[in-house]
């Protein structure tokens, strides 16, 4: 495999056209000399933009021989600079400039896209992923989990909960195309790599609610990634104890390409779990993004992904001590058997964009997603449950003994084909109308065959004196072949108020029709933003709307018992879950001890109807398959972003949240939803050694309330048990070597490299035993069930290397 990747990268490098890339860089200051962070820097002719960093620094790369660069900020006059370059060699220009306050003509202020947060989306700086210590292989989701309102109690998974929503309530878009994840994944160990490849990503936006009408039919969040077009030849390789990555890209005036490879093997990390055995998880992924401009008004693009995830596991032993100091128990298991899982996915999208004028933009996209998933296991375990009389582990009397046998043969094939059109027209300088419509065909074939037998002291559980029965058995076969028609229209308008400031409105409506249940939903949405001229360092926003989540395949499965056998059928009476949302927020930019900071605060309330109740076991979500509940979610999210030490970004997030539901038949009693967490604190802190700023320390901290738990067979309303608080600290130490700063980088073996990153990480620094779920042990001697905790990963070390050409 390594030889194959090397040959492929070499061939691609030899066949690409390398063009000279010109660079303009410098700092932006106010008239009083203060550095200005978050200034919009754009090339209007190329629809390219960025922001100055927290020190006011910027960098512009272009392959053109001349370019206009625009600098703009609310409350300041827009500056436009023209640069010309030699077409024979690369040029490097330094340009520092000052922005003047604009006290009269606010029309010069350029407010576009998400640069000034007039929507509910926030930009993510994906460069932090290179140094952020995480248990994943550089997934963008690791960065998302540090945002306010986002929670994840499993470092092995890329899934997250946003403001009390389930893992299935989050949309992910790549270049405007919605992407999907495997259906049958039950644990974080199986999950592997997410779809998004950070090496290919350019602009990343995340919204925790109140998003525009153009985004799909989910209730909680939107993660939007735009894959970039390289300006020049570029390449990079990286590796760690948990995997490897590689990418290569190039471009010329009409053509651009970028390819990415990822490999992950988490056996190094899974070895810290309490169940010892032979872990062999292998995850491989290839992606490409290619663009071609046959005409200055037309651009074609192709996005593709191929991935294969295999998870092979042969458990051997497990020993877990749990309980309180007055009632310690030891759960010991000896295993035989194995698990073999395979997930294969393929995705392709071909799009065309036509811009007849500067005001009009028309797009057409055809895409397809295919997944082939297999889960197979036969695992037998013999267990003993003993009292523990001391923390040293001295065993006492035996409280339970038995064995169990778990069997599964589950498979699923799914094909999703979509044709979509979108467009926009700039009616005036301050008014843009956009729209879109798509037709989606969904085909799913699923066969489930799984059962579990338990034997306690020679008796099957549940105990029956005459006919021994299985503890759990599910057999089903379902087929789905339906279509969806969806569309939206929205208008974005802004104007300059007479008394100063800018007001921005984004009003739209979205509709959805699904042939499976013949349901039509209409979703009106509104986002308002205000940028006061009197106080330009404060910005306000408000969003409201009626949001629907059209059921997915997992949500329409209703479980019933027929002749003592559990099975599932597809419930055609299912309706979309509905959420009426109100969100208000503000951003405050300020300097403290000459360091720039940004404070963001949002409060929200979501009234939930037609809830489809569900239960969570590890990462597996099982829906009731009926709209049998109503509820609410309310909370406060706070994030402080800035330089706690000069020149290095850090941020602190804090959330208070409560989400409750009332299920039909429970006397209108409200109980916590499966993702209810009262508090969640996250911190990403960076520092460096005084006098040696190139040596940096990175700390990722998370502390969240435990999730509600219920025993198998218990009503959801009786749930009063929670997992312990989730606590985790990951530590990283890094050193970046750069050409031009480190003299030896331009010599010998290191001459081809532009940058080298070396990082050492300690994952789960303090060795916290975080509980992911519980295994419930039943005994014949008593009716009690023992909740044996399933712990997540322990302390582990990791070394990362990254080379950029």
Residue ranges and their predicted role:
Residues 650, 702-712, 735-805:
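C-terminal beta-signal and adjacent terminal beta-strands/loops
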Residues 361-367, 573-627, 632, 757-761:
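Membrane-embedded beta-barrel scaffold of Gram-negative outer-membrane proteins
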Residues 293-309, 338-517, 600-603, 651:
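Face-selective signature of the C-terminal outer-membrane beta-barrel domain
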Residues 534-582, 603-623, 700-714, 769-773:
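Surface-exposed extracellular loop regions of Gram-negative outer-membrane beta-barrel proteins
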Residues 497-499, 605-607, 624-711, 802:
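Gram-negative outer-membrane beta-barrel transporters
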Residues 236, 240-263, 276-316, 339-368:
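Transmembrane beta-barrel wall of Gram-negative outer-membrane proteins
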Residues 75-77, 86-87, 93, 116-170, ...:
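Periplasmic N-terminal accessory/gating domains of Gram-negative outer-membrane beta-barrel systems
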Residues 19-108:
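Periplasm-facing N-terminal accessory domains of Gram-negative outer-membrane beta-barrel systems
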């Amino acid at each position: 495999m390594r030889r194959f990747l090397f040959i492929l990268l070499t061939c691609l490098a030899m066949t690409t056209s390398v063009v000279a890339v010109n660079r303009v860089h410098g700092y932006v200051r106010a008239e009083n000399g203060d550095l200005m962070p978050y200034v919009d820097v754009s090339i209007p002719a190329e629809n390219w933009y960025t922001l100055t960093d927290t020190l006011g620094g910027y960098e512009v790369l272009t392959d053109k021989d001349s370019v206009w660069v625009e600098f703009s900020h609310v409350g300041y006059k827009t500056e436009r600079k023209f640069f010309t370059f030699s077409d024979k060699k690369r040029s490097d220009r330094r340009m520092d400039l000052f922005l003047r306050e604009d006290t009269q003509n606010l029309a010069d202020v350029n407010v576009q896209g998400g640069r000034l947060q007039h929507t509910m989306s926030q930009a993510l700086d994906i460069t932090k992923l290179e140094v952020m210590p995480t248990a994943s292989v550089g997934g963008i989701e690791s960065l998302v989990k540090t945002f306010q309102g986002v929670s994840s109690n499993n470092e092995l998974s890329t899934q997250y909960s946003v403001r009390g929503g389930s893992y299935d309530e989050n949309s992910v878009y790549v270049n405007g195309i919605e992407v999907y994840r495997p259906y049958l994944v039950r644990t974080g160990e199986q999950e592997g790599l997410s779809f998004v490849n950070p090496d290919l990503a350019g602009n990343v936006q995340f919204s925790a609610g109140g998003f525009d009408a153009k985004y799909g039919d989910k209730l909680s969040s939107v993660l939007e990634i735009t894959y970039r077009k390289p300006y020049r030849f570029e390449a990079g390789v990286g590796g760690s104890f948990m995997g490897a990555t590689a990418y290569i890209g190039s471009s010329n005036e009409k053509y651009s390409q970028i390819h990415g490879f990822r490999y992950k093997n988490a056996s190094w990390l899974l070895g810290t779990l309490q169940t010892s055995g032979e872990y062999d998880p292998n995850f491989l992924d290839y992606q490409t993004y290619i663009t071609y401009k046959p005409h200055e008004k037309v651009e074609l693009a192709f996005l593709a992904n191929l991935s294969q995830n295999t998870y092979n596991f042969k458990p051997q032993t497990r020993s877990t001590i749990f309980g309180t100091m007055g009632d310690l128990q030891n759960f010991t298991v000896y295993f035989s058997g194995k698990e073999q899982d395979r997930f294969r996915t393929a995705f392709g999208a071909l799009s065309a964009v036509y811009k007849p004028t500067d005001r009009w933009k028309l797009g057409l996209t055809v895409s397809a997603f295919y997944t082939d998933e297999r889960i197979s296991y036969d695992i037998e375990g013999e267990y003993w449950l003993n009292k523990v009389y001391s923390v040293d582990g001295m065993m006492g009397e035996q409280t339970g003994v038995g064995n169990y046998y778990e069997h599964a043969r589950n498979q699923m094939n799914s094909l999703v084909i979509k044709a979509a059109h979108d467009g926009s027209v700039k009616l005036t300088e301050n008014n843009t109308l956009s729209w879109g419509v798509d037709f989606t065909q969904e085909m799913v074939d699923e066969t489930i065959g799984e059962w579990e037998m338990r034997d306690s002291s020679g008796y099957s559980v549940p105990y029956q004196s005459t006919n021994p029965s299985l503890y759990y058995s599910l057999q089903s076969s379902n087929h789905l072949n339906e279509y969806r028609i969806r569309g939206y229209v929205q208008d974005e308008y802004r104007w300059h108020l007479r008394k100063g400031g800018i007001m921005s409105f984004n009003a739209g409506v979205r509709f959805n029709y699904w042939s499976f249940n013949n349901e039509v939903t209409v979703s009106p949405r509104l986002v308002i933003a205000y940028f006061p001229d009197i106080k330009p360092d404060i910005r306000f926003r408000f969003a409201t709307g009626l949001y629907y989540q059209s059921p997915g395949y997992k949500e329409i499965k209703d479980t019933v018992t027929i002749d003592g056998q559990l099975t599932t059928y597809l419930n055609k009476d299912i309706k979309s879950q509905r959420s009426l949302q109100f969100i208000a927020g503000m951003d405050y930019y300020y300097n403290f001890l000459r360091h720039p900071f940004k404070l963001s605060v949002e409060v929200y309330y979501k009234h939930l109807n037609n809830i489809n109740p569900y239960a969570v076991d590890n990462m597996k979500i099982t829906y009731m398959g009926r709209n049998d509940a109503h509820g609410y979610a309310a909370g406060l999210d706070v994030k402080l972003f800035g330089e706690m030490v000069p020149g290095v970004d850090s941020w602190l997030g804090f959330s208070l949240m409560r989400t409750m539901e009332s299920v039909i038949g429970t006397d209108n009693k409200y109980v916590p939803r499966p993702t209810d967490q009262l508090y969640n604190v996250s911190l990403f802190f960076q520092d460096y050694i005084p006098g040696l700023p190139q040596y940096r320390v990175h700390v990722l901290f998370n502390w969240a309330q435990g999730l509600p738990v219920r025993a198998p067979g218990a009503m959801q309303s009786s749930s009063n048990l929670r997992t312990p608080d989730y606590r985790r600290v990951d530590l990283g130490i890094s050193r970046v070597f750069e050409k031009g700063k480190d003299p030896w980088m331009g010599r010998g073996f290191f001459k081809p490299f532009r940058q080298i990153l070396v990082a050492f990480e300690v994952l789960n620094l303090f060795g916290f035993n975080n509980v992911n779920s519980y295994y419930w042990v039943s005994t014949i001697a008593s009716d009690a069930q023992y909740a044996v905790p399933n712990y997540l990963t322990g302390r582990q070390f990791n070394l990362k290397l990254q080379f950029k050409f």
